A protein has these predicted regions:
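Conserved acetyl-CoA-binding loop-helix of GNAT-fold acetyltransferases
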Residues: 82, 88-101, 125, 129
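Alpha-helical elements of Rossmann-like donor-binding domains used by nucleotide-donor carbohydrate transfer enzymes
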Residues: 19-23, 38, 94, 98
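Active-site rim helix/loop that mediates acceptor-substrate recognition in acyltransferases
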Residues: 29-50
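Residue-level recognition of the GNAT/N-acetyltransferase active site
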Residues: 78, 83, 87, 117
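Conserved beta-strand in the GNAT
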Residues: 52, 57-66, 76, 81
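Conserved N-terminal entry element of GNAT/NAT acetyltransferase domains
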Residues: 1-14
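Conserved GNAT acetyl-CoA-binding A-motif
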Residues: 103-116
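Conserved active-site alpha-helix within GNAT-family acetyltransferase domains
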Residues: 93, 118-136, 141-142
Length: 145
């Protein structure tokens, strides 16, 4: 069995750009421009945190976005992905658990939220069994280009 660790990335490292780009290719069919500058924007921002799951190589990641509003601090989980070669081993759950522990330890009180496509059956089951509850609301987006 492989050893895995989850690391909160504090400094941008060129060596992470390729593996993150690879994971993004498995997460979305949308073309994503990801380079060192994009990594810098994430890890140097006080409003986001990037967690990397490593074995012998980078095998997964998760990002959280943090903001405050009049109704309290909100934390959004984004871009959760485990490389397809390592799925089915509970590694997505490890990433989610790490994000939850980080929020409890560093950001509480806060509300941790995420969205998931209903077609992603395994991901939705992971979130429900991790303690997330469905929020009956519509999510809308508008791309500012």
């Amino acid at each position: 069995m492989n050893e895995y660790s989850i690391e909160r990335i504090k400094l941008p490292m060129q060596e992470l750009v390729g593996p993150i780009r690879h994971l993004l290719g498995q997460l979305t069919t949308k073309e994503v421009e990801f380079d060192l500058e994009a990594l810098e924007r994430i890890v140097l921002s006080p409003s986001s945190e990037l967690f990397i799951l490593r074995g012998e190589e980078v095998v997964g990641m998760l990002t959280i976005g943090i903001y405050s509003s009049p109704t309290g601090r909100k934390v959004w989980v984004e871009d959760v992905v485990v490389d397809s070669r390592w799925r089915g081993q509970g590694l997505g759950r490890e990433l989610i658990n790490e994000a939850m522990k980080y929020c409890q330890r560093e950001l509480a009180p806060c509300t941790l939220m995420l969205t998931s496509n209903p077609a992603r059956i395994e991901a939705n089951e992971l979130y429900r069994t991790s303690g997330f509850e469905p929020k009956h609301t519509n999510v809308y987006k508008y791309d500012c280009l």
